[in-house]
From Swiss-Prot:
The lineage of its organism: Bacteria, Bacillati, Cyanobacteriota, Cyanophyceae, Oscillatoriophycideae. Its main location: membrane. Keywords: Antenna complex, Bile pigment, Chromophore, Electron transport, Membrane, Photosynthesis, Phycobilisome, Thylakoid, Transport. (2R,3E)-phycoerythrobilin 2 binds at residue 139. It is a peripheral membrane protein. This is C-phycoerythrin alpha chain. It comes from Synechocystis sp. (strain PCC 6701). (2R,3E)-phycoerythrobilin 1 binds at residue 82. Gene3D superfamilies: Phycocyanins. It comes from the Bacteria. It holds the Pfam family Phycobilisome. Heterodimer of an alpha and a beta chain. Belongs to the phycobiliprotein family. Light-harvesting photosynthetic bile pigment-protein from the phycobiliprotein complex. Contains two covalently linked bilin chromophores.
Length: 164
């Protein structure tokens, strides 16, 4: 799994050197942000179902045509799969918060996602809308500390950009 620490060590090892001062500063910054990431991960884990449902509802409200016969959200099975996918992305964001890097997202969520959706004829815009809603709904200090919200939002942005 890729994290800041494993990335720094792997890069130094590949170059046949010890980690540089800037490498170690990067690791130190990641460690200093760990408490905020864990706060965000804990809140997300506790509220995953509610966050996913609100995000799903916002996406379907914007893209209501998807409920029409023959569209991507026209059956209960399709609706359940869409909600499942949103939960999957949020769970991977949770894992990424814990490890302090994008490894879980890169390995289990982003690699090949657009091709899969295109092959299945699924639009990515509703997923972008759902994740954007989750990002825009977060509020400091109501939901999370400012730093925890920043960590959470940066990973949401990472996924949104990969789907866009």
């Amino acid at each position: 799994m890729k994290s800041v620490i494993t990335t720094v060590v792997a890069a130094a090892d590949a170059a046949g050197r010890f980690p540089s001062t800037s490498d170690l500063e990067s690791v130190q910054g990641s460690i200093q942000r760990a408490a905020a990431r864990l706060e965000a991960a804990e809140k997300l884990a506790a509220n995953l179902d509610a966050v996913a449902k609100e995000a799903y509802d916002a996406a379907i409200k914007k893209y209501s045509y998807l409920n029409n016969a023959g569209e991507a959200n026209s059956t209960d099975t399709f609706k359940a799969k869409c909600l499942r996918d949103i939960k999957h992305y949020l769970r991977l964001i949770n894992y990424s918060l814990v490890v302090g890097g994008t490894g879980p997202l890169d390995e289990w969520g982003i690699a090949g996602q657009r091709e899969v959706y295109r092959t299945l004829g699924l639009p990515t815009a509703p997923y972008v809308e759902a994740l954007s809603f989750a990002r825009n709904r977060g509020c400091s200090p109501r939901d999370l500390s400012a730093q925890a919200l920043t960590e959470y939002n940066s990973l949401l942005d990472y996924v949104i950009n990969s789907l866009s």
